[in-house]
Amino acid sequence: MLLEGEGGGGPALQGTVSVNPPAITKYETVNVDVTVSGLLTSHRVFVQCQSDLENGLVCVAAYCPVNGTLRFRISNWSSNGIDGAARTWAYQAYV
């Protein structure tokens, strides 16, 4: 995916990571950080879970807060606590 004004090719980085969210209480949002070598705060990051999340869990953001860290903000929009399973997520990072 190219953004307007960019003439480059594909992603600077791409791969998969395992994301295992903690138990999330109802209506709460948590950060889940994973290490991605070479990821920079200047990268625009796109992620996609490779299997269905539990009903009520939503990834509301993914970004690089510090070099080498990919942060997932995962919200529980349900009225019950959810302990989500570890899942494989694909990522692409663009300059």
Residue ranges and their predicted role:
Residues M1-L39, N67-L70, S75-V95:
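Extracellular receptor-binding modules and their adjoining Ser/Thr/Gly/Asp/Asn-rich linkers
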Residues L53-V66:
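Low-complexity "stalk/linker" and mucin-like segments enriched in Ser/Thr/Pro/Ala/Gly
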